[in-house]
Amino acid sequence: MLFRSTGGATTSASAPTPAPGVAVAAPIPSLAAGLDAEDDEDTPAVLKVAETLTIVVEEEPSLEDAPTTVPSAALKEEAAAPEPAQSYSDSEMLDVVAQALENGRVDLYLRPTVTLPERRPRYFEALTRIRTRSDELITPSAYLSVAESSGMIPLIDNVQLVKSVQALRRLGPKSRIKGFFCNISVRTLLDPEFFPELVEFMEENSGLSESLIFEVNQPAILALETSELGSLDTLGALGYRFSLDHVSDLDVDFAGLRDRHFRFVKVDSKTFLHDMEVGGKGLPGADMKSYLDTFDLKLVVDQVDDEGTVAKLLDYGVELAQGNLFGAPKPVSPALLRELEEADAA
């Protein structure tokens, strides 16, 4: 099996069949349309989806119009975010997601990935939040299952990619921020309607290939057949790189990852430290950092929430980390981009 150092049976990760009674999202539109309005600040970019759903990707206001502070209500880490005040049935949540897509209420949030020991942001993980009509924030943990079963995940990925490209363009090539990790689902990579448009869009923005990193989770990748991995090769041929997230099985074929254009491996702190201190069946955590280095793979330790964990990570030479301790996700806004620019100039 690819990405695993030992053999075993695999199961296909083809797009799931929609759940009974759940509406299916319309075909995916052109991603390039999401940037059509970039030169006209008064016109939102509109992505048309067949005749039933229109996705709006609103252009961010200019830096001159930026507020001096970022709304504090939007600065909560997803893991610490409260459950929505209202309880939603699947059909109600489906309507919330569809309305958010139609009305430009799918927001991009950025969570810092910092260097150690300096704790300087060098990367950001791009995340999405959905706002209801009453501006209640809905995190992926609440809407993901419905979005997946209804086929709306590619639409949400669509918005995330367009907004990530917009933000990276604003930061510019001289920024010290090296890139964004953009979470993308395997369903999106396998979608026959969406993927050709994705390739075209990424080819048009190939100048950002060093800055935009596609992030996929290990369980989904392990479930792919070799024949389904062509999407990774296609994007890799354009110069784009990948990050493997949610790594819980350290029995990994790192050479295979490298050959498939993976350059980052993310492991949560508990998994990483447990293997260091107790010993796991796969690669011992104590050797993981140096071993990854031999394949030019960067280790990122996630879910770092306290100083004690940082001290242990430093003992093992970890150089990149993210978690509540270093900053919660913030909504992309002119204020945030200005903050990043000022950090660059410092």
Each language-model region and where it sits:
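Short, small-residue-biased leader/transition segments that mark boundaries at the very start
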Residues: 1-2
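Low-complexity, Pro/Ser/Thr/Gly/Ala-rich intrinsically disordered linkers and tails that serve as
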Residues: 10-33, 37-45, 52, 62, ...
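EAL-family c-di-GMP phosphodiesterase catalytic domain
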Residues: 43, 186-188, 215-223, 240-346
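Flexible, glycine/charge-rich interdomain/linker segments that couple
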Residues: 53-88, 177-184, 331-332
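Active-site core of bacterial EAL-family cyclic-dinucleotide phosphodiesterase domains
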Residues: 55, 76-146, 327-331
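Short acidic-capped amphipathic helix/loop micro-motif used as an active-site/signal-coupling element
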Residues: 132-137, 161-165, 246, 323
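Catalytic core of bacterial c-di-GMP phosphodiesterases, primarily the EAL and HD-GYP domains
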Residues: 152-227, 303
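Charged helix-capping and loop-helix junction motifs
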Residues: 196-199, 227-230, 279-286
